[in-house]
Curated annotation (Swiss-Prot):
It comes from the Bacteria. This is UPF0434 protein Pfl01_4174. GO terms for cellular component: cytosol. Belongs to the UPF0434 family. It holds the Pfam family Trm112p.
Amino acid sequence: MDTKLLDILACPVCKGPLKLSADKTELISKGAGLAYPIRDGIPVMLESEARTLTTDERLDK
């Protein structure tokens, strides 16, 4: 996924910023507490496809 997209993409739930996960397989929304998967280089920005962040992930900066 092109990291330049992070400048223009926003979480569809809370409209907050997104962060690329360390392994580059998810876009993380701390505001919504969700992780959106990246499949074949394309972020899947659907709430129904996102997973809920764990407590540790929410607290991690």
